[in-house]
Amino acid sequence: MPDYRRVRVPGGTYFFTVNLLERYPNDLLVRHIDVLRESVRRVRCRYPFHIDACVVLPDHLHAIWTLPEGDADYADRWRTIKQHFSRAMASTEYRSEVRQRRGERGIWQRRFWEHAIRDDRDFAAHCDYVHINPVKHGHVERVRDWPFSTFSRFVAAGIYPEHWAEAPSIDGVQGDR
């Protein structure tokens, strides 16, 4: 079994990718967005953290969090969010023998990707990645049209223009990005 080593910076800012176990076609996260939001809210009440940026796609999500000073326990937060969400779902998913033996649901991948944000440039690059993701995956043509993202918050704060990442149109023909 691989030995995963996670970077833990107390009070740090982190980028995450969290995936459903069965990715395609699966719209569980957007179909149950209110359950996901409530799961996050409940965890934030008990284990505070700031959501700097976030996008929820049908089968995975990306988030940037900043943890409180002296706190580096993002893994427990994700574990608890996944548990709350899973408990709210009807148990209809396929579960492998291993998951059955361990008493696990078959909703989430066990692990998640994390990256410690190094500086302002790294933060900005990951915010761009978060917000362009619905376009990258073909869910919308314009970033501003995806409803499950912090993009509108960034526009309201003057960080992005409303038409950010939209290709220019010349005589009705879409241009390159």
Where are these regions (language model features)?
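Short catalytic/metal-binding and nucleic-acid-binding patches
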Residues: 1-177
